[in-house]
């Protein structure tokens, strides 16, 4: 993937960048792997706003992704590499020899015609998926399960990767993209390689309208709201917030306030906390 820059022909174009989509081989998704995706606008089943800054955006269809990678022993070939509007990573359509088709996250370096395999006997090759116990120490992986058979939950965004550091009993030590070292059950599966589209983080949106196309609404400062909308709101003109520390919209301390539970169940699996960024 390369970044495409634009001439400043307008204020919206000045500084704007996009992907050149050189890795994308088709713009026609596999119809059998599409599902309807209804917009919620950040509302729950009572119609109440639960997630701010969501709404509008271009109509999308959901691509059904195989995060479980449980088609053991059956080889498949990459048919296409496609854009997915629902995630930062690209996806690859796999045609298996038994006729089934599935989408997977497209790892870096995968191309049309590449053969992939899942299962304990699969080779250590980019795109293959194996239980962590079968993956050598030092291997770069992505799409990691937290529970065997549940499907990959960790390391799925564009450009992310994790590394297998060691094996202790029924657990495998994995260093995540954040720097956190975590113990994961050795029966959990992971895919080999780094997630592709690694320059996604370098894209400059350029204008507010492009965020609206994605369904992202504006983020308004609390200090310009009314007192009934935000703890920082109210006052005459540019008034100070009038509190000891900044507050979230729900009255909780923010900007440095720790939000993780003090007795989180997953603490026993974390060997080293993530690096401060």
Curated annotation (Swiss-Prot):
GO biological process: cytoplasmic translation
Pfam families membership: Ribosomal_L2, Ribosomal_L2_C
Any one cellular-component term (Gene Ontology): large ribosomal subunit
Domain of life: Bacteria
Region (Disordered): 36-58, 219-277
Sequence intervals crossing the membrane: none
Record's keyword annotation contains 4Fe-4S: no
InterPro entries (UniProt xref): NA-bd_OB-fold, Rib_uL2_dom2, Ribosomal_uL2, Ribosomal_uL2_bac/org-type, Ribosomal_uL2_C, Ribosomal_uL2_CS, Ribosomal_uL2_dom3, Ribosomal_uL2_RNA-bd_dom
Keywords: Ribonucleoprotein, Ribosomal protein, RNA-binding, rRNA-binding
Record field: compositional bias (Basic residues): 258-277
GO MF annotations in UniProt: rRNA binding; structural constituent of ribosome; transferase activity
PANTHER family referenced in this protein's UniProt entry, alphabetically: LARGE RIBOSOMAL SUBUNIT PROTEIN UL2M (PTHR13691:SF5), RIBOSOMAL PROTEIN L2 (PTHR13691)
Family from the record: Belongs to the universal ribosomal protein uL2 family.
Subunit structure: Part of the 50S ribosomal subunit. Forms a bridge to the 30S subunit in the 70S ribosome.
Function, in words: One of the primary rRNA binding proteins. Required for association of the 30S and 50S subunits to form the 70S ribosome, for tRNA binding and peptide bond formation. It has been suggested to have peptidyltransferase activity; this is somewhat controversial. Makes several contacts with the 16S rRNA in the 70S ribosome.
This protein's name: Large ribosomal subunit protein uL2
């Amino acid at each position: 993937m390369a970044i495409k820059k634009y001439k400043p022909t307008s204020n919206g174009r000045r500084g704007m960048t996009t992907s050149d989509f050189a890795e994308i081989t088709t713009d026609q998704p596999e119809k059998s792997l599409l599902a309807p995706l209804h917009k919620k606008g950040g509302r729950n089943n009572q119609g109440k706003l639960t997630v701010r800054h969501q709404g509008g955006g271009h109509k999308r269809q959901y691509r059904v992704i195989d995060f479980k990678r449980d088609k053991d022993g059956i080889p498949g070939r990459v048919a296409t590499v496609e854009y997915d509007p629902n995630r930062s990573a690209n996806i690859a359509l796999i045609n298996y020899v038994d006729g089934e088709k599935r989408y997977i996250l497209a790892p870096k370096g995968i191309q049309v015609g590449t053969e992939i395999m899942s299962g304990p006997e699969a080779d250590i090759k980019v795109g293959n998926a194996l239980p962590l116990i079968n993956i050598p120490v030092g291997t770069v992986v992505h799409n990691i399960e937290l529970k065997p058979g549940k499907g990959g939950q960790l390391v799925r965004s564009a450009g992310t990767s994790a590394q297998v550091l060691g094996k202790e009993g029924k657990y495998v030590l994995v260093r995540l993209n954040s720097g956190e070292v975590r113990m994961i059950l050795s029966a959990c599966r992971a895919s080999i390689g780094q997630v592709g589209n690694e320059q996604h983080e370098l894209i400059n949106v350029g204008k507010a309208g492009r965020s609206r196309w994605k369904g992202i609404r504006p983020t308004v400062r609390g200090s310009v709201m009314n007192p009934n909308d935000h703890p920082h709101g109210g006052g005459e003109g540019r008034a100070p917030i009038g509190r000891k520390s900044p507050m979230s919209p729900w009255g909780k301390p923010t900007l440095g306030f720790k939000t993780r539970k003090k007795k989180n169940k997953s603490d026993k699996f974390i060997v080293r906390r993530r690096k401060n960024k």
